[in-house]
Amino acid sequence: MAQITMYTDGSALGNPGPGGYGVVLMSGPHRKEISAGYRLTTNNRMELLAVIVGLEALKADGNDVTIYSDSKYVVDSVSKGWLFDWERKNFKDRKNDDLWRRFLAIYRRHRVRFIWIKGHAENPENELCDRMANGCAHGANLMEDIGYRP
């Protein structure tokens, strides 16, 4: 069982618009950075997708994962239990249910703790995630966010 620290950020230009996410994973001496961009999406989808991709990148189950995010949407949905209420109601009338279902599948394989951090507050890893997310949103060859629904 590893101790993992994860920083995430997501952005969308126009909301909806082109978007991207950035993830920094750290465990002991190991560090991994992940990012990608999408043609049409929202900032909330990119914030949530960053967390999902980070968790999916872990090679084994049962890790202790601390996730630092500046997204109240993601942090509060989990920490305040809203997500589990939505799940009990089969995500009726909930946006991003495709991503929340994907999140739950990987979330339950680890011990995850969320910590909200203020964005643009000079945290080096959060700032790096922000630069990666924005860089990807401005990039060429953006992917399609097939789950996005206006």
Question: Residues of each region from the PLM?
Answer:
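RNase H catalytic domain
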Residues: 8-18, 52-128, 132, 137
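RNase H-like nuclease fold core
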Residues: 1-45, 49, 53-63, 131, ...
